[in-house]
Amino acid sequence: MSGEEEKAADFYVRYYVGHKGKFGHEFLEFEFRPNGSLRYANNSNYKNDTMIRKEATVSESVLSELKRIIEDSEIMQEDDDNWPEPDKIGRQELEILYKNEHISFTTGKIGALADVNNSKDPDGLRSFYYLVQDLKCLVFSLIGLHFKIKPI
């Protein structure tokens, strides 16, 4: 494996948010793999909805932008020890493998920025909160564009 291939293989991002409630296990999950594979799943049983699963392949430039977003967030320096524990309201998980570093965060659902500001680690949780917002926005845009554009 060349140095570039090895660097590319050393990258992975996975995000999960979900809970188990009266409509069963409802969740949103997505992951980016080193080969550019984007996997997305959204499960809601509300009004007998079915699970939505999508897969797409993103370009190297999209992966580069994803890496830039992660670097700018400074999330790799954070620690989830003082973040709220998952509870019946739900849980969030974020796993990132990047530049020979691996982080895996688990916390409760964050309803509003006030929850972040009132936590034991507002600065760290704020980094997580905004990074997750950016990642979800990117994923929803990519999935939306990929599956709605009709070829000529």
Curated annotation (Swiss-Prot):
It is found in: Nucleus. It comes from the Eukaryota. InterPro entries: Mago_nashi, Mago_nashi_sf. Disruption phenotype: RNAi-mediated knockdown results in embryonic lethality due to developmental arrest during morphogenesis. RNAi-mediated knockdown in the syncytial gonads of adult hermaphrodites results in some inviable embryos and then eventually no egg laying. The keyword DNA damage does not apply. Keywords: Developmental protein, Differentiation, mRNA processing, mRNA splicing, mRNA transport, Nucleus, Oogenesis, Transport. Expressed in the soma and germline of hermaphrodites. GO terms for cellular component: catalytic step 2 spliceosome; exon-exon junction complex. Belongs to the mago nashi family. Heterodimer with rnp-4/RBM8A. Part of the mRNA splicing-dependent exon junction complex (EJC) complex; the core complex contains CASC3, EIF4A3, mag-1/MAGOH and rnp-4/RBM8A. This is Protein mago nashi homolog. It comes from Caenorhabditis elegans.
